[in-house]
Swiss-Prot record:
This is ATP synthase subunit beta 2. SMART domains: AAA. Produces ATP from ADP in the presence of a proton gradient across the membrane. The catalytic sites are hosted primarily by the beta subunits. Signal peptide: none annotated. Keywords: ATP synthesis, ATP-binding, Cell inner membrane, Cell membrane, CF(1), Hydrogen ion transport, Ion transport, Membrane, Nucleotide-binding, Translocase, Transport. Its main location: membrane. It comes from the Bacteria. It is a peripheral membrane protein. GO terms for molecular function: ATP binding; ATP hydrolysis activity; proton-transporting ATP synthase activity, rotational mechanism; proton-transporting ATPase activity, rotational mechanism. GO terms for cellular component: plasma membrane; proton-transporting ATP synthase complex. It is found in: Cell inner membrane. Its EC number is 7.1.2.2. It comes from Nitrosospira multiformis (strain ATCC 25196 / NCIMB 11849 / C 71).
Length: 470
């Protein structure tokens, strides 16, 4: 390596323990969060995380450390990790270092900015509450998302988190004139490749940027990829004054990567092995997602819940930052009610009459009440049968079952699996359908007629032809 540059510090590797590297500098060591390079061609990148004494620092490797040995020269790059920003990044796929991974030439006119930024000050934040429509009935009616807010997709493995995120990318591209940033943290390489091809086939790649920290990469890279994606999103919000949809899959992998880094750094673990700084690290990321006077970053984040335990510290900390929570139910998935969203466990803080309006609030509350009463009656039905219920309770059960089926929806991103054409439903059409079901206007129709349709009118005789596979 070049040791002739007097303005950049040169050190030597003092110790290597897995992904943790101790480095000694003869002069002043680099500052915290600086990047240093080592290896035969400078291919090993290390981020400084702590200073041990006047001459020694400790860092986490952001790349594999094969071939690294004590005594190797280390060069300070003179700055922190940076990410490319600008219109040149649209329709491209990057890794944590801002290098393209889509087999195309790198963007030639992209700007580069540090991934470490402070959240916007309070005076720049907007306090207006606006609904961010997704085109998905159950979300827009029962747990409306807030423009500039954060929503969590909570669920265990295999209940449809990634499918729901992909559908939102498709719908938002057609409904909102903005930019989508997809951040894959700990993604399987196969899933990232499939997602890229699906989005390209759907024709929404031109207004999208994809950033991946794959599960085979070191924990340091997976920990920093979310900051890189957020830096790209902040450019479109602050410089181009555009609305941004930031999709994160999976925020639990961000916490998990931080836990690995913390363990490697020798920090004392807290409850269930998580890092003691988990709350701070998550807040530093989440508070940068905001609605300002320039634009808004609206974030939808998948949260893997270990063993479906919602009291897990990672789920609890993530949940505290969300303005809406979308809880996916394995039981509903087993019943074929897709999207498998639990309407009673899910909710939104902005679902108040002053924000969403009296009519929307009334319909949502009546719907929840009907579904909650049906849940209470399920045990009675299982033991005694439906015939033992009063006529009023039987009518309530019929309404609830029709509501459950009306809230199913065919997705554009699953057309090639199901053979059913995807449907995008406006909030007004979704509210109208719920209201008509609550008024028993469809009591003479079989409940299956409301399954996997868009508008409620499609279930009526002479309405849109329903796919036979429903």
């Amino acid at each position: 390596m070049d040791a002739a540059a007097p303005d950049l510090g040169i050190g030597i590797v003092a110790a290597v323990r897995g992904g943790i590297v101790d480095i000694r500098f003869a002069n002043r060591p680099p500052s915290i969060r600086s990047l240093v390079r080592t290896g035969k061609a400078g291919e090993i990148v290390i981020e400084i995380l702590s200073q041990l004494d006047a001459h020694r620092v400790r860092g986490i490797a952001l790349t594999p450390t094969q071939g690294l040995a004590r005594g190797m020269l280390v060069k300070d790059t003179g700055g922190p990790l940076r990410a490319p920003v600008g219109r040149a990044t649209l329709s491209r796929m990057f890794d944590v270092f801002g290098e393209v991974i889509d087999r195309k030439p790198p963007p030639c006119d992209a700007q580069w900015r540090t991934v470490h930024h402070s959240p916007p000050p309070l005076v720049r934040r907007s306090t207006r509450s606006e609904i961010f429509e997704t085109g998905i009935k159950i979300i827009d009616v029962l747990m409306p998302l807030e423009r500039g807010g954060k929503a969590g997709l909570l669920g265990g493995a295999g209940v449809g988190k990634t499918i729901l995120l992909t559908e939102m990318i498709h719908n938002v591209a057609g409904r909102h004139r903005g930019v989508s940033i997809f951040c894959g943290i700990g993604e399987r390489c196969r899933e990232g490749e499939e997602l890229y091809r699906d989005i390209m086939a759907a024709g929404v790649l031109e207004n999208m940027v994809m950033v991946f920290g794959q599960m085979n990469e070191p924990p340091g890279a997976r920990f920093r990829v979310a900051h890189a994606a957020l830096t790209m999103a902040e450019y479109f919000r602050d410089d181009e004054h555009r609305d941004v949809l930031l999709l994160v899959d999976n925020i639990y992998r961000f916490i998990q990567a931080g836990m690995e880094v913390s363990g490697l750094m020798g920090q004392m673990p807290s409850r269930m092995g998580y890092q003691p700084t988990m709350g701070t690290e998550l807040a530093q990321l989440e508070e940068r997602i905001a609605h300002t006077d320039n634009g808004a970053i609206t974030s939808i984040q998948a949260v893997y819940v270990p063993a479906d335990d919602f009291s897990d510290p990672a789920a609890v900390h993530a949940f505290s930052h969300f303005s809406a929570s979308i809880v996916l139910s394995r039981k509903r998935a087993s019943e074929g009610l897709y999207p498998a969203i639990d309407p009673l466990q899910s909710g939104a803080k902005m679902a108040t009459p002053s924000v969403i309006g009296e009519r929307h609030y009334r319909i949502a509350q009546e719907t929840r009440h009907t579904l909650a009463q049906y849940t209470e009656l399920k045990d009675v039905i299982a033991m005694l049968g439906l015939e033992q219920l009063s006529p009023e309770d039987r009518a309530l059960v019929a309404r609830a079952r029709r509501l459950e089926r009306f809230f199913t929806q065919p997705f554009f991103t699953t057309e090639h699996f199901t053979g059913i054409k995807g449907k995008l439903v406006s909030l007004e059409d979704a509210l109208d359908g719920c209201e008509r079901i609550l008024r028993d206007e469809y009591r003479d129709l079989p409940e299956q007629a409301l399954y996997m349709i868009g508008k409620a009118s499609e279930a009526e005789p002479g309405g849109s032809a329903k796919n036979a596979s429903s």
